[in-house]
């Protein structure tokens, strides 16, 4: 009996963004609570997705300027790769005052909270939902706010994923430039130049146009201007890399710093990495990625996030990712985000460490779609024992 061969269409069953779908598409189906929570410095619009599980932390997100939690994080949390993670953790999305969809304008004379005050509002959110601790995920301004929150309340923060974080106050040259650009540049253009690198603006016209339209049509312009002004008036976080025998201000929790290699925030993130505890910090540089890695490469970011929480002791039985499987099949040792690894530093001088007992660990896998190169940052102490912070390129 002869059998005919038929073409089978293996197109994606549910694309990340359907044609014509709004950028603020719905999250996956969860029990969702939306509340306006009164805090020490005013009201916050908060969305809790899922049910907190016992003593397990909740993922708490904070967005960047020109965005809200939907435009900043929906593509990531809607992605297939995040589904396993959100089965283990509830997610609490915080919108900065006046940045949520449909937000009314603040009255004339309203004093918008400073960045420090925005961080001081977060304990009230945890108390409202009965949460003991969180794993923070912040982008840009949101990353700064969550870092300040962790510095003020280390007992409430078990870990931080910080995208495009800038730990420094805006210099007077930057301040002057922002004032001048405010006179000559439309608000959407100012935000776009903050979110995207020049190359990305030129090459990803459709994505940039989508966000420009979101800023024009969905954001309250007066409220957005207040949030931008607060971010441009931020203080230096005044964090320092800890040294033996000294007392320094730094994060006490594990931190994953994330930046695209074409992001306008690369230098700021590298600067932040140099100020944190090298035994608790990982720097993830995403190749061929611009200013919004959670939008352009959600699968890679979800994978890195899974490694991160596994390093914290959660999700030990999580399934192996595509990258882990491909590396195992190729015969290479599987790398994690914890422990010592050899690396060369281009910015801090050569610090390659030989590990003769472990043999050669070649990290080049040109046959694979994704590469994960992990190497320790300088501990700045001269002591080679113990774990070092990592720099990851993927």
Swiss-Prot record:
Region annotated Disordered, chain positions: 325-394
Cellular component aspect of the GO annotation: adherens junction; centrosome; cytoplasm; cytosol; microtubule; myelin sheath; nucleus; perinuclear region of cytoplasm
InterPro entries: AB_hydrolase_fold, NDRG
Family: Belongs to the NDRG family.
Bias (Polar residues): 327-339, 374-386
Assembly notes: Interacts with RAB4A (membrane-bound form); the interaction involves NDRG1 in vesicular recycling of CDH1. Interacts with APOA1, APOA2, PRA1 and RTN1.
Post-translational modification: Under stress conditions, phosphorylated in the C-terminal on many serine and threonine residues. Phosphorylated in vitro by PKA. Phosphorylation enhanced by increased intracellular cAMP levels. Homocysteine induces dephosphorylation. Phosphorylation by SGK1 is cell cycle dependent.
Positions of modified residues (Phosphothreonine): 328, 335, 340, 346, 356, 366, 375
SUPFAM superfamilies associated with the record: alpha/beta-Hydrolases
PANTHER family documented for this protein: N-MYC DOWNSTREAM REGULATED (PTHR11034)
Residues where Phosphoserine is found: 2, 319, 326, 330, 332-333, 336, 342, 352, 362, 364
Superkingdom, natural source: Eukaryota
Major localisation: cytoplasm
Gene: Ndrg1
Entry keywords, A to Z: Acetylation, Cell membrane, Cytoplasm, Cytoskeleton, Membrane, Microtubule, Nucleus, Phosphoprotein, Repeat
GO term, biological process aspect, one: peripheral nervous system myelin maintenance
Subcellular location: Cytoplasm, Cytosol; Cytoplasm, Cytoskeleton, Microtubule organizing center, Centrosome; Nucleus; Cell membrane
Species this protein is from: Mus musculus
Region called 3 X 10 AA tandem repeats of G-[PST]-R-S-R-S-H-T-S-E, residue ranges: 339-368
Name of the protein described by the UniProt record: Protein NDRG1
Deletion consequences: Mutant mice exhibit defects in peripheral nerve development. Initial hind limb weakness developed around age 12 weeks, and significant functional impairment (dragging of hind legs) and muscle atrophy became apparent at age 1 year. After about 5 weeks extensive demyelination of nerve fibers is observed. In later life, large inclusions were seen in the adaxonal Schwann cell cytoplasm. There is no evidence of apoptotic response.
Induction section of the entry: Repressed by testosterone and also to a lesser extent by dihydrotestosterone. Down-regulated by MYCN.
Biased composition (Basic and acidic residues): 345-371
Sequence repeats: 339-348, 349-358, 359-368
Function: Stress-responsive protein involved in hormone responses, cell growth, and differentiation. Acts as a tumor suppressor in many cell types. Necessary but not sufficient for p53/TP53-mediated caspase activation and apoptosis. Required for vesicular recycling of CDH1 and TF. May also function in lipid trafficking. Protects cells from spindle disruption damage. Functions in p53/TP53-dependent mitotic spindle checkpoint. Regulates microtubule dynamics and maintains euploidy.
Organs and tissues of expression: Widely expressed, with highest levels in kidney followed by brain, pancreas, small intestine, colon and spleen (at protein level). Also detected in heart and preputial gland, and in much smaller quantities in other tissues. Not detected in duodenum and prostate. Highly expressed in Schwann cells.
N-acetylserine modifications at: 2
